[in-house]
Amino acid sequence: MAVNCNNGTLNVYVPDQNNPWNISKVLFVFRRLGFSVKFKEVKNYLNSNPNDLIDELFDQALNMPVSPDPGWANFNNADFSSSGKNRGAFFRDHQKIVFEDFLNNGLRERLTLFWSNHFVTEYYMYNHPAYTFRYYNNLQKNALGNFKEFVRNIGLDDAMLMYLNGYENKNNAPNENYARELYELFTLGEGNGYTQDDITETARALTGYNSRTNGGPISFNPNRFDDGEKTIFGKTGNWNYDDVIEILFEEKTDLIANFICI
């Protein structure tokens, strides 16, 4: 069943005498699709076709590269220890990058901020500036992309694996935290279309992402993967991480769309 959660008109805005394209509307656009606009630029936008302006803002956001590596995006614990700076200084450097991006990048960073509140992590849980920066890049890269691929990518993000205990999820000691939040917070909503058995079986399919050397990237360890059969949403097989994403989006398409929409 298709879901329509749009409560307004879908008619294309056409300026006229009763509803003109003016300063108020230009500012409205940039407040909704960014964080405002320099007032000296407003005059130029007043001379633009509003629909062309919207297309331009989306094209810019879609083609914008992620924030470049500040020089420490791939540091491990040893690199941070030998840098001569404490980790708080790196975190503050990252904050400056984020604020500059907010000022300069408009729509893409507006959506990056939005998704950071959806696929949330908390820095104090892992205290790793490189993880935080790569998580930020992950949000930027997927902010206007395919939601299914976004979900696939975010679950393997080092910051997320640390924050929701994915790195502790092993075949001999499964951890259900990420499996639960994948459904409850990220895709379906609390108690909506899944059972505790689905969570338990999903956690088994997500095992194995545990290998980490000196605070470097987290990688898959097949020796810690549960390679037995699992039943998720009524489907049985030797499911793994990618299978979970495929089954979720095949079986729960409308529920996901409705949850994200509202």
Language-model regions, residue ranges each:
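Substrate/cofactor-recognition hotspot
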Residues: 2-17, 25, 29-33
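Extreme N-terminal leader/anchor segments
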Residues: 16-20, 45
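Active-site substrate-binding loop specific to GH73 endo-beta-N-acetylglucosaminidase modules
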Residues: 1-8, 73-77, 92-98, 128-262
